[in-house]
Swiss-Prot record:
Heterodimer with SLC30A6/ZNT6; form a functional zinc ion transmembrane transporter. The gene is slc30a5. The lineage of its organism: Eukaryota, Metazoa, Chordata, Craniata, Vertebrata. Residues 50-52, 116-117, 170-189, 256-263, 321-338, 436-444, 506-516, 626-629 are lumenal. This is Proton-coupled zinc antiporter SLC30A5. Residues 555-571, 579-589 have a biased composition (Basic residues). GO terms for cellular component: endoplasmic reticulum membrane; ER to Golgi transport vesicle membrane; Golgi apparatus; Golgi cis cisterna membrane; Golgi membrane; secretory granule membrane; trans-Golgi network membrane.
Length: 777
């Protein structure tokens, strides 16, 4: 039997079509790689051609060249069934929409350049459909697809905000009041009314064209089936497009002055673009989609064309490429037009990652849970649980639910409101800095934006602490707030250290400081931070013990079992020992256990306090510099602030480290010791061993203890007494294990190792005698 029909298909964890061997796909991958590189080269050449050829004439020539080739080789009129009148109407509509999308595509190319056009427009339909599915439906495909959608959005944002594309070249290319045609004038006017720059408008235009193109391809599938195939439809559509564009091209040729000195010099560039962009890419991608999985073809194709775009973007403006191009260009444009920037490189990385994730196949083999066997002995599996577990909500629904949870709880609500206030002030400061060209305002604005990361971390931690416990995280996520506070504390220590080092260096050589905008910025920041001080002061004063913000981290008890089988072993996991099989305690403890340490809120408060001290220091140093010219005041204030920040964050780090290291809570340590003394005096209890107590979160103190009791003692009564004593001491999640002599004898019989038998024997000896030496029968 062949391998693809063997039992390994079942054991591989996936049912369905068997993939072709990688050796057979290598030729198609190499062909796809070569084709995508040629297409990227053709797009770069198209950008050069569009500088001298009108966009409508350019599209007309591309459609005409591809029509001649496809009509000659496809023979759409002689092959296949005859086309009806209704189908011809659909073909005309198809051609018209294709012309519109081509206009948007190539106009975006003139605005953004070839590299950015390839990054934005050359995405497979699978990638875009997966992206839209994640954003607007509830069946997004899991966390990986959501992560891919987030990467795609981040990539577009990087192009919009962090890609400093050429400004002077754009001004020289289309000065105000002059445009090549009514079409370009209309689009430039639209960008002006929207208030966006041409580069950013080109990015948005290409994203819009990409969505239109995917919808256009999806709607064309039924028509291609009716016509007789996608290749026949493409040939007829290009032919009709040439007919539609012909009157427009004739009018443009008669009414506008041409920039082209000799059309013969453009024959080879146009042939290159027609062959690489319009013909070869269409045919090769059609073949590869059939021979390979569409998702695999999309992943390889996206990576190859993006990598080719980065490679050509780095070398296309190099003087060596003058030998590769057929057109003459001014020398000063070789290094100014759409060059590589940090923003576009980061964007390309995120586009590659998003394409790999979104194009991955969501068809996975389900791993079922063994639930038993049939009467014939066949194993039975349950797949429904995993299927339900792997479903995830869409991004808008997830954000809506998260916002609802944030606003329900006091601490997260306070962090969210202050984060919004801080972000508003930050963006106002950045906007005013850009408007006034103030580097000081811009640097302080981005500094505050960086500080908002601490608030975001605190907000996420406050939200995660309310997540329900899972099979993997059985204690829940309450300790996330401890981790958040610890990270914020370490972050502040690093800041204080670098501020201290810089302040010491500036004491010996105080620099000149421009104080023009320092005072209003510092006063505004001080007002914002004082609001945060008032909002988070309760976190610094008494942690999580606040009547207005009760903790939602309930102390769930585990199951309490009192066994009195042949070996008389009592074993219980209980929160308070009721005399029945299973007990659960969901009540809040308002005793000493409720006074927990909310390290997350303390970390947020420490960050706000550090910013407040910074604003005060800037105000004081500004006054001293203006009034007395004391330049040394700035490093002295910074030195003082660094010491204060370090001193204020040390208690937070100390408490967080104690919780992480599972120390007995200080506020319950004395009560636990008293409770242990009372436990040792209980009737019927001989001794106890292995007492472990630790703080899990702000409202949960957990513990375990083993108690040795006499043979005639009722286990549940001992469990109830021990649990009650430790609960009063502040332990609200307790596990009690009751041990009798028969249990040790049973374990000694089962043990085969010498050390195990020795330990059990010693434990039996401690059980047989009271503290006064009386022997127990």
């Amino acid at each position: 039997m062949e391998e693809k029909y063997s039992s390994n298909v079942m054991s591989s964890g996936r049912l369905g079509p068997v993939d072709a061997p990688e050796s057979r796909l290598t030729r198609y991958i190499v062909l796809l790689c070569f084709t995508k590189f040629l297409k990227a080269l053709g797009i770069f050449e198209s950008y050069d051609l569009l500088k001298v050829v009108h966009i409508v004439q350019f599209i007309f020539i591309l459609k005409l060249g591809s029509t001649c080739f496809m009509v000659l080789f496809q023979k759409p009129f002689s092959s296949g069934k005859s086309i009806t009148k209704r189908q011809w109407v659909s073909i005309v509509k198809h051609a018209f929409v294709s012309c519109i999308i081509s206009l948007l595509w190539f106009f975006g190319l003139t605005l953004c350049g070839p590299l950015r056009t390839l990054l934005l427009f050359e995405h497979s339909d699978i990638v875009v459909i997966s992206l839209l599915t994640v954003l607007f439906t509830g069946s997004g495909g899991g966390p990986s697809k959501t992560r891919g959608a987030a990467f795609f959005i981040i990539a577009v944002i990087c192009l919009l905000l962090f890609d400093n594309d050429d400004l002077m070249a754009k001004i020289a290319e289309h000065p105000e009041g002059h445009h090549d045609s009514a079409l370009t004038h209309f689009l430039y006017r639209a960008f002006f009314l929207l208030g966006v720059a041409d580069h950013k408008g080109g990015v948005l235009l290409l994203v819009l064209a990409l969505c239109f193109n995917v919808g256009f391809h999806t709607a064309s599938r039924k028509l291609s089936l009716d016509i007789g195939g996608a290749k026949r439809l493409q040939a007829l559509s290009h032919l009709v497009s040439v007919i539609i564009l012909s009157p427009w091209v004739i009018i443009l040729s008669a009414t506008t002055e041409s920039k082209i000195e000799s059309w013969s010099a453009l024959i080879m560039p146009f042939m290159t673009v027609i062959f690489s962009v319009m013909i070869m890419d269409f045919y090769v991608e059609s073949v590869c989609s059939v021979k390979m999985e569409p998702s695999k073809c999309a992943r390889y194709g996206s990576f190859l064309i993006f990598a080719s775009a980065l490679l050509l973007g780095n070398f296309w403006t190099h003087p060596i490429t003058d030998q590769l191009r057929a057109m003459n260009k001014p020398a000063h444009q070789l290094h100014t037009e759409h060059v590589l920037s940090g923003g576009v490189v980061v964007s390309a990385i995120f586009f590659i990652l998003s394409a790999q994730i979104l194009a991955s196949s969501s068809r996975k083999g389900q791993r079922g849970t063994l639930v038993g066997y049939s009467p014939e002995g066949t194993p039975l599996y349950n797949f429904m649980g995993d299927a339900l577990h792997n479903t995830s909500p869409s991004m808008p629904r997830f954000l809506k639910d998260s916002l609802k949870q944030i606003l329900e709880e006091y601490d997260s609500r306070q962090i969210f409101y202050f984060l919004c206030l801080n972000l508003a002030f930050t963006f106002v400061e950045i906007f005013y800095g850009v408007w006034t060209n103030s580097l000081g305002l811009l640097s302080d604005g981005f500094h505050m934006l960086f500080d908002c990361s601490a608030l975001v971390m605190g907000l996420i931690a406050a939200l995660m602490t309310r997540w329900k416990a899972t099979r993997i995280f059985s204690y829940g996520y309450g300790r996330v707030e401890i981790l958040s506070g610890f990270i914020n504390g370490l972050f502040l220590v690093v800041i204080a250290f670098f501020v201290f080092i810089e302040a010491v260096a500036r004491i010996y050589d105080p620099p000149d400081i421009n104080t023009d905008m320092l005072t209003p910025v510092s006063v505004g920041g001080l007002i914002v931070n004082l609001v945060g001080i008032c909002a988070f002061s309760h976190a610094h004063s008494h942690g999580a013990a606040r009547g207005g913000c009760p903790s939602h981290d309930h102390g769930h008890s585990h199951h309490g079992h009192g066994h009195s089988h042949g070996h008389n072993h009592g074993h219980s996991h209980s929160d308070h020992g009721h005399n029945h099989g299973h007990t659960h305690n969901h009540g809040h403890s308002h005793g000493s256990a409720g006074v927990g340490m909310n390290a997350n809120m303390r970390g947020v408060f420490s960050h706000v306090l550090a910013d407040t001290l910074g604003s005060v220091g800037v105000i004081v140093s500004t006054i001293l510099i203006r009034q007395f010219g004391w330049l040394i005041a700035d490093p002295l204030c910074s030195l003082f602030i660094a010491v204060l920040i370090f001193g204020s964050v040390l208690p937070l780090l100390k408490d967080a480290c104690q919780v992480i290291l599972l120390r007995i809570p200080q506020e319950t340590e004395k009560g636990i010791n008293i409770a242990l003394e009372k436990i040792s005096n209980l009737d019927g209890l001989i001794s106890y061993r292995d007492p472990h107590f630790w703080r899990h979160s702000a409202s949960l103190v957990a513990g375990t203890i083993h108690v040795q009791v006499m043979s005639d003692v009722v286990e549940q009564r001992i469990i109830q007494q021990v649990t009650s004593l430790l609960k009063d001491a502040g332990v609200n999640n307790l596990t009690v294990q009751v041990e009798k002599e028969a249990y040790f004898q049973h374990m000694s019989g089962l043990s085969t190792g010498f050390q195990d038998v020795l330990i059990m024997t010693k434990q039996m000896d401690t059980i047989k005698y009271y503290k006064d030496g009386t022997y127990i029968m």
